[in-house]
């Protein structure tokens, strides 16, 4: 059984006299920066010239610098940029400023695990990955709570890398909820698998296929939207709250019987074989190479797929229906 670590297990004093540079001020960046600041840590934010996030960071009372200056000034660097831009920013602005004894941090292991970023042997390389979006990381911290985190050590130059990772997790509120130790490989491969097979790829394909099946059979698109997309949140909320058991305990007997007897016909042996193939593509680096090359070539296929998905009938139906949802209008 995996062990969870909490506030008493981590020593925030390891960050007390350090300057932490948060590179990027998006969803995770703003949460990490503000939570660390409120934990009494000296924080600077590294942004590229002309960044639209600069004013937001300054309005929050944070010192903003360009990325190279932030990396130079900091003892601790946390890269919170999209995976596809990290390598270029690292090579241009961060690597020249990585002196011995510094800490290089990530919230996802992609670039380290797949060799896009190769750090010098003289720095600690760690990961602290909150298992929730940035707005939740920030909101729960302000409420005196936190979001569970994963933490890992890739390189321990100082002999303190593990303790440092735990201290950082405490600084952003993770140890209030509990943090779980992993490795860069395990986090990266399981994260990609979950995204592709279940959370994003699998769920999106399932929703669209269900919608298309009902519409093709002559049912109103609006009803198909409600049954195959809108109600997903109702079910997922129950699962998150208490697992599959709570969900099944909360739905009707009719729904539960249909779940248990028909669900296995959707995820077949062929589906499971495809899941294993997708996992092999992740483990071998095939997916990573494909993604890197796609971005290096200007994302032509990615852009075309985005355009095609945006034109799917479920998007237009959903747009019209959501306009009538009064509870969404204030968001």
UniProtKB/Swiss-Prot annotation:
Span of domain KARI C-terminal knotted: 183-328
Function: Involved in the biosynthesis of branched-chain amino acids (BCAA). Catalyzes an alkyl-migration followed by a ketol-acid reduction of (S)-2-acetolactate (S2AL) to yield (R)-2,3-dihydroxy-isovalerate. In the isomerase reaction, S2AL is rearranged via a Mg-dependent methyl migration to produce 3-hydroxy-3-methyl-2-ketobutyrate (HMKB). In the reductase reaction, this 2-ketoacid undergoes a metal-dependent reduction by NADPH to yield (R)-2,3-dihydroxy-isovalerate.
UniProt cross-references to InterPro entries, sorted A to Z: 6-PGluconate_DH-like_C_sf, KARI, KARI_C, KARI_N, KARI_prok, NAD(P)-bd_dom_sf
Protein name: Ketol-acid reductoisomerase (NADP(+))
GO cellular component, one term: cytosol
Top EC class of this enzyme: oxidoreductase
Chain's gene name: ilvC
Positions of the catalytic residues: 108
């Amino acid at each position: 059984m995996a062990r969870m670590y909490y506030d008493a297990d981590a020593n925030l004093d390891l960050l007390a006299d350090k300057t932490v540079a948060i590179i990027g001020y998006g969803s995770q960046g703003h949460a990490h920066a503000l939570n660390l600041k409120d934990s009494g840590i000296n924080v600077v934010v590294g942004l590229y010239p002309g960044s639209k996030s600069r004013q937001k960071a300054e309005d929050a009372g944070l010192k903003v610098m360009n990325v190279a200056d932030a990396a130079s000034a900091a003892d601790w660097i946390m890269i919170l940029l999209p995976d596809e831009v990290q390598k270029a920013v690292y090579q241009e602005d961060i690597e020249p400023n990585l002196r011995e004894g510094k800490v290089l941090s990530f919230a996802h292991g992609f670039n380290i695990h797949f060799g896009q970023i190769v750090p010098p042997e003289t720095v600690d390389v760690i990961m602290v990955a909150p298992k929730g979006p940035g707005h939740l990381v920030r909101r729960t911290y302000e409420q005196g709570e936190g979001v569970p985190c994963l933490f890992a050590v890739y390189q321990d130059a100082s002999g303190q890398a593990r303790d440092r990772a735990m201290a950082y997790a405490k600084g952003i509120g993770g140890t209030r909820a509990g943090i779980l130790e992993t490795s860069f490989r395990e986090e990266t491969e399981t994260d990609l698998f979950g995204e592709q097979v279940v959370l994003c790829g699998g769920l999106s394909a399932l929703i669209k296929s269900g919608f298309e099946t009902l519409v093709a059979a002559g049912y109103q698109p609006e009803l198909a939207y409600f049954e195959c997309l809108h109600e997903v949140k109702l079910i997922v909320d129950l699962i998150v709250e208490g697992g599959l058991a709570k969900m099944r305990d909360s739905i009707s007997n009719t729904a539960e019987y249909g779940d248990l007897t028909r669900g296995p016909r959707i995820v077949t042996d062929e589906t499971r074989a495809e899941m294993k193939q997708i996992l092999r593509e992740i483990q071998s680096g095939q997916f990573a190479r494909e993604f890197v090359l796609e971005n290096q070539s200007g994302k032509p296929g990615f852009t075309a797929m985005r355009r095609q998905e945006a034109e799917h009938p479920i998007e237009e139906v959903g747009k019209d229906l959501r306009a009538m949802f009064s509870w969404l209008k204030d968001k």
